[in-house]
């Protein structure tokens, strides 16, 4: 048993798809890229360059994209400035934050998660969601087969997004992957044991 798992049972949180589309101005019948990238403490002087490389790779696909602002760590403000430059593209939607239940619902509906958020490692496998994990922030963490690791270079990121979106074998493996952080049923298992 692993402790403190999140219950990610889809039937418990997924709002109606049309409400999600309306709220976030998306067409979920088309590809959607979700971008969540935070500053890395020991690389804060590179935060702006790192998010720019990511967004350049994302923009090259011209798919509807949801970009969530980074956390409040050092370097986050400069990343937000850079993110806001990309709102000139009509397919880029930015949000300072998203309610947790909506975030989980987006993980259930989008085509790929891109960035360096721990949710690529911890939550995304529960949804079979392909994830492009960029840089060193999640280094050393166990991960499922849904994760593609890459560096902060737009060409590498672009190729990884392509694999996540179009490699049918990779997508099949991601869809069927086992979450190394559990299935969200720790409480039930504890009750059964007791």
Model-identified regions with their sequence ranges:
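Nucleotide-activated sugar donor-binding and catalytic core shared by glycosyltransferases
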Residues: 1-194
């Amino acid at each position: 048993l692993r402790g403190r798992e999140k219950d990610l049972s889809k039937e418990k949180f997924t709002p109606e798809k049309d409400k999600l589309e309306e709220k976030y101005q998306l067409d979920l019948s088309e590809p959607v890229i979700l971008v969540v990238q935070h500053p890395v403490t020991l690389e804060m002087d590179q935060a702006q360059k790192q998010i720019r490389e990511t967004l350049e790779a994302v923009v090259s696909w011209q798919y509807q994209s949801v970009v969530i602002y980074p956390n409040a760590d050092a370097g986050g403000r400069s990343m937000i400035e850079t993110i806001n430059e990309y709102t000139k593209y009509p397919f880029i939607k930015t949000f300072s934050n998203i309610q947790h239940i909506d975030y989980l619902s987006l993980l259930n509906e989008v085509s790929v998660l891109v960035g360096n958020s721990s949710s690529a490692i911890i939550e995304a496998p529960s949804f079979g969601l392909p994830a492009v994990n960029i840089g060193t922030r999640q280094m050393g963490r166990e991960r499922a087969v849904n994760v593609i690791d890459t560096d902060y270079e737009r060409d590498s990121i672009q190729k990884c997004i392509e694999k996540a979106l179009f490699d049918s074998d990779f997508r099949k493996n991601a869809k069927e992957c086992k979450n190394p952080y559990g299935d969200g049923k720790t409480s039930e298992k504890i009750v059964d044991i007791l």
